[in-house]
UniProtKB/Swiss-Prot annotation:
Function, in words: Probable peripherally associated component of the endosomal sorting required for transport complex III (ESCRT-III) which is involved in multivesicular bodies (MVBs) formation and sorting of endosomal cargo proteins into MVBs. MVBs contain intraluminal vesicles (ILVs) that are generated by invagination and scission from the limiting membrane of the endosome and mostly are delivered to lysosomes enabling degradation of membrane proteins, such as stimulated growth factor receptors, lysosomal enzymes and lipids.
UniProt region (Interaction with VPS4A, MITD1 and STAMBP), positions on chain: 180-196
Cysteine disulfide links: none
Region ranges (Interaction with VPS4B): 183-199
Membrane topology annotation: Peripheral membrane protein
Region (Interaction with VTA1): 180-199
GO molecular function per UniProt: identical protein binding; MIT domain binding; protein domain specific binding
Annotated protein name in UniProt: Charged multivesicular body protein 1b
Expression sites by tissue: Widely expressed. Expressed in pancreas, kidney, skeletal muscle, liver, lung, placenta and brain.
Effect the entry attributes to changing residue 181 to R: Abolishes interaction with SPAScT and no effect on interaction with VPS4A
Stretches of the chain forming a coiled coil according to its record: 26-48, 178-199
Record annotation: effect of changing residue 188 to A: Abolishes interaction with SPAST and VPS4A
Region listing for Interaction with IST1, in residue ranges: 132-156
Length: 199
């Protein structure tokens, strides 16, 4: 097995591992959603909110893993092409010895240009691999947008057939719905302010 074939194997393996990680995160998200429903049914909104944050985090992680898996898979496909073309060139080299006449008519400039393209592709491959590593490291620090948490809480309450406002303990009534509405109101206010500034 050549170095390039080993590299290809490692890329394909990495793509599968990333895909497995995405599926694991999907399972974790579903488990957290089930915990949200139980917490809402018990009227424990603080615990429900924690599970909602965890569920959103797992969902975001799953998307990131899936995206990276696709990128690594795309890079692996490029390497596969390069490895295959390398093999074709070697097999051609054996045949070429008996093809002096054909060799004499070959355009060396075109061969040289083709080699340059190969080298450039592998340089690009290295850059993309580095970008992939940088992206993966940056996605490990994930924040959980509160409006997503609020929306998920409402969705889980709806699925459980509960009215959040009715089931909430005294003093917390309507906190989820209100915070979503106020967040939307804040966003509208900011948009209006930006429009005024532009005029």
């Amino acid at each position: 097995m050549s170095n390039m074939e080993k590299h290809l194997f490692n890329l394909k393996f990495a793509a599968k591992e990333l895909s497995r990680s995405a599926k694991k995160c999907d399972k974790e998200e579903k488990a957290e959603k089930a915990k949200i429903k139980k917490a809402i049914q018990k009227g424990n909104m603080e615990v429900a909110r924690i599970h909602a944050e965890n569920a959103i985090r797992q969902k975001n992680q799953a998307v990131n893993f899936l995206r990276m898996s696709a990128r690594v898979d795309a890079v692996a496909a490029r390497v596969q092409t390069a490895v295959t073309m390398g093999k074709v060139t070697k097999s051609m080299a054996g045949v070429v010895k008996s093809m002096d006449a054909t060799l004499k008519t070959m355009n060396l400039e075109k061969i040289s240009a083709l080699m340059d393209k190969f080298e450039h592709q592998f340089e690009t491959l290295d850059v993309q691999t580095q970008q992939m590593e940088d992206t993966m490291s940056s996605t490990t620090t994930l924040t959980t947008p509160q409006n997503q948490v609020d929306m998920l809480l409402q969705e889980m309450a709806d699925e459980a057939g509960l009215d959040l406002n009715m089931e909430l303990p005294q003093g917390q009534t309507g906190s989820v719905g209100t915070s979503v509405a106020s967040a939307e109101q804040d966003e509208l206010s900011q948009r209006l302010a930006r429009l005024r500034d532009q005029v």
